[in-house]
Amino acid sequence: DESIEQNIIFSAMQTNGKFLKKIGWMRLYDGAAGKSHAEEMVKTLDIRCTGIKQPAGALSGGNQQKVCLARALTLEPDILFVSEPTRGIDIGAKKLVLEYLAKLNREQGMTVIIVSSELMELRSVADRIGIISDGKLACILKPDDSDADFGLAMSGAWKGGRKDA
């Protein structure tokens, strides 16, 4: 059961060489950089813990979800795919996570693709919402399209062809 710090930084360290310092021919873990980044992610995503050395498995499900998000964000992807990013997270933290994802898109140009069963959450942050019905893309709607359009699309009764936003 690895610490919160290791859960957040390990993938980026292994795949991108982040948090490593070169000493001669060796590359060693830069503990100060890793610790600083992990602490920043804990603060940014409001991960409720006793500290970054706490085992991630000891956290609540919602806080474990935020650690997973922190790990993905540490990789600094151009495109971030997240599935149910607010599942198990308390209401206040849901807003924080969604606003942070929107901020990454707005300020860093990161494309964020969210798969979610929470339509109201999607409508609060997305600029386009693709509706999948019977395994096919039924339509693409704008967040401010009518509830009736969303209802028809989600029920599989959409007859208007693709409504691309």
Task: Please name every model-derived segment.
Residues D1-L59, L141-P143, D147-K159:
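Conserved P-loop NTPase catalytic core
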Residues K95-E107:
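Helical segment within the ABC ATPase nucleotide-binding domain
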Residues S83, D90:
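ABC-family nucleotide-binding domains
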Residues T74-D78, E84:
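A short, proline-enriched helix->beta-strand linker immediately N-terminal to the Walker B motif
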Residues G109-V115:
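Conserved H-loop
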Residues L122-S124:
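A short, surface-exposed alpha-helical micro-motif characterized by mixed small hydrophobic
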Residues R128, I140:
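Short, glycine/charged-rich "phosphate-handling" switch motifs in NTP-dependent
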